[in-house]
């Protein structure tokens, strides 16, 4: 039995999320079905983590265990014939048997895209159509509130036994086409954490939320008390980095 690390990219608008759900189109379900069909036995796909309905991935990672010698390039081509066009396996590489796609993650990078310009019907599944200008310098200043090791339970839509997470860096760029790109670097993220932080930053920017409110969310952590959440369509899992 050999273990392989895979990288998959997908358009989340065509799926009900990563995790398998009965009678629903999910990325994990599609991959397991396709690998099992080609290999000829039940194959379990373990991802680096879950993405919600509508969330996209540029480089989501997973591992699979496969018996015998295989031609990786041929396997990738066969898999992609079954899962395209909205999901594509980019690479498969042999790794140590002890490797785990979820438990050995060092850093995850998420991007969130906001269109501050005119509404664009071609982008509705891929960016938050805010249709409102944002103060970039204020965005950057307010983003520092979320840096460091903190209890982010208020910024999660699920109960967690350990809601302490570390966000090491947040970068914010405005591009010429009125697109604002927020990039989050962290060791891991709670469910909906990035989307809730983005919504807070936008509300702070548009004077719909006070800085004191954010402080209270950290002082009195409670699941989902942040309330506001940016649309899933603007969120992308960009990179997953592992310990060497």
UniProtKB/Swiss-Prot annotation:
Reaction(s) catalysed (UniProt annotation): uridine(38/39/40) in tRNA = pseudouridine(38/39/40) in tRNA
Major enzyme class: isomerase
Any one GO molecular-function label of the UniProt entry: tRNA pseudouridine(38-40) synthase activity
Any GO BP annotation: tRNA pseudouridine synthesis
UniProt keyword list: Isomerase, tRNA processing
CDD domains given in the database record: PseudoU_synth_EcTruA (cd02570)
Quaternary state and interactors: Homodimer.
Signal peptide limits: none
InterPro entries per the UniProt record, alphabetical: PsdUridine_synth_cat_dom_sf, PsdUridine_synth_TruA, PsdUridine_synth_TruA_a/b_dom, PsdUridine_synth_TruA_C, TruA/RsuA/RluB/E/F_N
Protein name (database record): tRNA pseudouridine synthase A
Function recorded in the entry: Formation of pseudouridine at positions 38, 39 and 40 in the anticodon stem and loop of transfer RNAs.
Source species, domain of life: Bacteria
Homology family: Belongs to the tRNA pseudouridine synthase TruA family.
Active-site residue list: 52
Enzyme Commission code(s) on record: 5.4.99.12
Binding, substrate: 110
Alphabetical list of Pfam families matching this protein: PseudoU_synth_1 (PF01416)
């Amino acid at each position: 039995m050999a273990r392989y690390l895979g990288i998959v990219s997908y358009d989340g608008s065509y799926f009900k999320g990563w995790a398998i759900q009965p009678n629903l189109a999910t990325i994990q379900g599609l991959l397991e079905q396709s690998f099992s069909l080609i290999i000829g036995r039940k194959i379990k796909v373990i991802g680096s983590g879950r993405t919600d309905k509508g969330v996209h991935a540029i480089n989501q990672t997973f591992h699979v265990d496969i018996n015998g010698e295989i031609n990786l390039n041929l396997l990738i081509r066969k898999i992609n014939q079954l899962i395209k066009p909205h999901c594509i396996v980019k690479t498969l590489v042999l790794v140590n048997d002890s490797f785990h796609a979820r438990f050995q993650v060092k850093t995850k990078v998420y991007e969130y895209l906001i269109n501050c310009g005119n509404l664009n019907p071609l982008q509705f599944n891929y960016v938050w159509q805010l249709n409102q200008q944002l103060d970039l310098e204020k965005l950057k200043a307010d983003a520092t509130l979320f840096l460091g090791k903190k209890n982010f339970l208020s910024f999660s839509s699920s109960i967690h036994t350990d809601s302490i997470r570390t966000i090491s860096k947040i970068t914010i760029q405005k591009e010429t086409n009125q697109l604002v790109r927020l990039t989050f670097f962290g060791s891991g993220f709670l469910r909906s954490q990035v989307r809730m932080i983005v919504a807070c930053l936008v509300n702070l920017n548009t004077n719909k939320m006070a800085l004191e409110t954010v402080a209270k969310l950290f002082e009195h952590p409670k699941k989902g008390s942040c309330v506001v959440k940016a649309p899933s369509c603007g969120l992308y899992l960009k990179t997953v980095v592992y310990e060497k």
